[in-house]
């Protein structure tokens, strides 16, 4: 069953700065109406992305949101999101969406980290559901779904993706707002009024 026009999804995307990454959560309806925005930050190269995503959800306090879409699983330079933990926290299905084919993150993780930092990231990464390619119009995206089967997740992604876009609208809006937030609050904090 495809989402109805008034159905809502929370899209989460990040924009990275040197030390912090700006996350934005955008609530968007399937008919492309933007309903709400919320912001949080996480550490670039840290291990707090899952907690930041949970903060976004808590700040929204939007029981009408039916799905969470997240742009990838490793925002903020390998700050992995535990999709199961986010789904459990929000009591909502979570679908991670990426836009490029990949051989996976295990090799890059091993190149960048060692010891406990590597072990922690590998533990999260290995628990992620498999990545599946999905056709959305003329484009191919890659999804990992928690709390929803792959076919239903593909329907959700397609329903929130405008024709010819290749990117679900909640993620497009969240990415734009995260970038604007990063420029305002992280890149030039001296220009931010108290």
Where do the protein language model's features map onto the residues?
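Charge-patterned, long linear interaction tracts outside catalytic cores
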Residues: 145-194
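A glycine-rich, hydrophobic loop/mini-helix early in the fold
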Residues: 21-76
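Gly/Ser/Thr-rich loops at beta-strand to alpha-helix junctions
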Residues: 15-18, 72-80, 100-103, 148-150
């Amino acid at each position: 069953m495809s989402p109805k026009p008034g159905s809502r999804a929370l899209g989460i995307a990040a924009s990275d700065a040197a030390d912090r990454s700006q996350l934005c959560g955008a609530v968007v309806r399937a008919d492309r109406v933007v309903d709400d925005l919320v912001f949080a930050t996480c550490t670039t190269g840290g291990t707090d992305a899952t907690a930041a995503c949970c903060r976004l959800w808590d700040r929204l306090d939007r029981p009408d949101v039916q799905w969470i879409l997240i742009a990838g699983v490793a925002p903020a330079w390998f700050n992995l999101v535990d999709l199961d933990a986010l789904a459990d926290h929000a009591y909502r299905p979570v679908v991670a969406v990426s836009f490029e084919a990949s051989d996976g993150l295990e090799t890059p993780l091993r190149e960048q980290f060692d010891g406990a930092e590597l072990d922690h990231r590998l533990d999260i990464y290995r628990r992620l559901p498999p990545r599946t390619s999905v056709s959305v119009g003329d484009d191919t995206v890659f999804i990992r779904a928690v709390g929803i089967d792959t076919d239903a997740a593909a329907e959700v992604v397609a329903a929130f993706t405008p024709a010819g876009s290749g990117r679900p609208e909640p993620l497009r809006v969240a990415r734009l707002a995260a970038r604007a937030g990063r420029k305002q609050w992280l890149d030039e904090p001296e220009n931010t009024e108290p």
